[in-house]
Curated annotation (Swiss-Prot):
Family recorded in the similarity comment: Belongs to the elongation factor P family.
Record key words, sorted: Cytoplasm, Elongation factor, Protein biosynthesis
Species whose genome carries this gene: Geobacter sulfurreducens (strain ATCC 51573 / DSM 12127 / PCA)
Highest taxon above the source species: Bacteria
Name recorded for this polypeptide: Elongation factor P 2
Role description: Involved in peptide bond synthesis. Stimulates efficient translation and peptide-bond synthesis on native or reconstituted 70S ribosomes in vitro. Probably functions indirectly by altering the affinity of the ribosome for aminoacyl-tRNA, thus increasing their reactivity as acceptors for peptidyl transferase.
Amino acid sequence: MYTVADLKKGLKLTLDGAPYLVIAFEFSKPGKGQALYRTKMRNMITGVILDRTYRSGETFEPARLEERRMQYLYKEDTHYTFMDNQTFEQVQMDEDAVGDAKNFLIDNLEVDILLFGEKAIGVTLPNFVNLRVVQTDPWVKGDTSGSDSKPATVETGYILRVPPFIEEGEMIVIDTRSGEYSTRVKG
């Protein structure tokens, strides 16, 4: 059990049966009366943000979250399917819960899935992924009038800016945290 004194940014707790992440916290002690704890929390399933004020002595349940290593299998309609490599158990996530991670998911990619009970509520990607460029404009040697980058589409449909020497069919390394080109795959 957490008390209001335990509240801080980044704390994960259960409120009304759903997991919440504290994203802002403020303590105030008026001249007379009890101390007040103002919080801003994000529902980890729906993304809804709550503003709540609590008084000293109130308690909260910690969020029972588990992170498991899983393998991305496939997408069907708006659902993404992942498999636990130890138990071979499969879980599905809605496109909204997957978020921007969908731009970097390729078959058999190992990811960490955040579970609340049996419900998958989040995906943590590796910091870098290798993806194949499927469409980009050709580079004209000696063309110095253009910029130092050009748009490219990778196999997942994600569009990013790459250096002009990158060609269709090449494998590139993308930083999943920023979504930017990192380097060309060697070999």
